[in-house]
Curated annotation (Swiss-Prot):
Record's GO cellular component terms: plasma membrane
Statement: the UniProt record of this protein carries the keyword Magnesium: no
Originating species: Escherichia coli (strain K12)
Lineage, top ranks: Bacteria, Pseudomonadati, Pseudomonadota, Gammaproteobacteria, Enterobacterales
Disruption phenotype: Abolishes glycolate oxidase activity. Is unable to grow on glycolate as the sole source of carbon, in contrast to wild type.
Name this polypeptide is given: Glycolate oxidase iron-sulfur subunit
């Protein structure tokens, strides 16, 4: 796809990068077939190809309006289109650039600005998020439905973590929302890894991965959080930590992008590249281990929801399922498993109606095989699916750790 950049855009390094990405697109339209928002809305501008045209028009100096912003905002960034694209278009990078340029040219309505700023001030701060969640649980009957639905109906308390006692050690990103919404997930991870001879090291100075800010178009703040994490992890990396582990695939997908996002930062480019190379999802670590040592015989019938950030962003589709099958669990078939559940980070709060439709469609698919429980690999998906109030939804490692206790 050829573009005629304006003089302003020719002076913009990110616009030049966008132009380079656009050149790979042959506007074949394969991407529209797997786009969740296009399937729901049937509007070309709510599919990847249409959004690519909108970004092209922005780069060429056409008028940028709230409608332009609305169509770009409606994208889930699920990256299903990237899995489908035969030309290898880096759509998510293009979208980030397009959104950033549009954000500078269009002033959002006040309610949108308040919501987005509120999310940015709360979600990345675990203590604030925990306190407000506790208040929300008390006030649940009086809250709007879309907020009420996001509060956990139940949480499993974190079990004790084992001491640092093994030579093999990994860092683990604790996350922002997960310690409050699913506090046992990281503890269960540490306990399973301990049985395999791997200790999880704390990195207390590390914080939010940066995805919340970045995807709400506060991209510089997102990059600042990335730099903070690199600094927090670096001493442990130099001391020989073999991996940086993520139990939330949304965080993992973003940390794996640090190298790309900071490639032009003279101070952080090399460190960011090394961090991205060390970043692994939990399943990447476990699949290489002798799981038979755990002596688990899974006795549950599960439906696994593979998050978009795991299957499309990290290209790990089918890997959790293989691990669960190795451990003896029974898995049901899930129709249209490539489609997004509608969580998409903060999307379920910024676009509640679309998110709810996608959630209900996904729950119908997950429940079609009549599982005892639904398991997933990302806290956003877990919370969003659970908000339907139907089949119980947990992180898959918790179910593995439960089975471990029975042995």
């Amino acid at each position: 796809m050829q573009t005629q950049l304006t003089e302003e855009m020719r002076q913009n390094a990110r616009a030049l990068e966008a132009d380079s990405i656009l050149r790979a697109c042959v506007h074949c339209g394969f991407c529209t077939a797997t786009c969740p928002t296009y399937q729901l809305l049937g509007d070309e501008l709510d599919g990847p190809r249409g959004r690519i045209y909108l970004i092209k028009q922005v780069l060429e100096g056409n008028e940028v309006t709230l409608k332009t912003q609305e169509h770009l905002d409606r994208c889930l960034t699920c990256r299903n289109c990237e899995t489908t694209c035969p030309s290898g278009v880096r759509y998510h990078n293009l979208l980030d650039i397009g959104r950033d340029i549009v954000e500078q040219k269009v002033k959002r309505p006040l309610p949108e600005r308040i919501l987005r700023e509120g999310l940015r001030q709360v979600v990345p701060r675990p203590a604030v998020f925990r306190a407000l969640t506790q208040v929300g649980l008390v006030l649940r009957p009086f809250l709007p439905e879309q907020v009420r639905a996001k509060l956990p109906a139940e949480t499993v308390k974190a079990k004790p973590r084992p001491p640092l006692r093994h030579k093999r050690r990994v860092l683990m990103l604790e996350g922002c929302a997960q310690p409050t919404l699913s506090p046992n997930t990281n503890a269960a991870t540490a306990r399973v890894l301990d049985r395999l001879g791997i200790s999880v090291m704390p990195a207390n100075e590390a914080g939010c991965c940066g995805a919340v800010d970045y995807h709400l178009n506060a991209q510089e703040k997102g990059l600042a959080r990335a730099r903070n994490n690199i600094d927090a992890w670096w001493p442990a990396i130099e001391a020989g930590a073999e991996a940086i582990l993520q139990t939330a695939s949304g965080c993992g997908a973003f940390v794996k992008e640090y190298g790309q996002m900071l490639k032009n930062d003279a101070l952080y480019a090399d460190k960011a590249r090394q961090v991205s190379e060390l970043a692994v999802d939990l399943v990447e670590l476990l699949r290489e281990e002798p799981l038979e040592k755990l002596a688990i015989r899974g006795d549950k019938k599960l439906a696994f929801h593979c998050p978009c950030t795991l299957q499309h962003a990290q290209k790990l589709n089918g890997e959790v399922e293989k691990v669960l099958l190795r451990l003896g669990f029974t898995l049901t078939d899930v129709p249209d498993s490539h489609l997004c559940c509608g969580s998409a980070g903060t999307y379920a709060l910024t676009h509640p109606d679309l998110a709810r439709q996608l959630r209900d469609n996904k729950m119908n698919a997950l429940e079609s095989g009549k599982p005892e429980m639904i398991v997933t690999a990302n806290i956003g998906c877990q919370t969003h699916l659970a908000s339907a109030g139907r089949t119980s939804v947990r992180h898959w490692i918790e179910i593995v750790e439960q089975a471990l206790e029975k042995e």
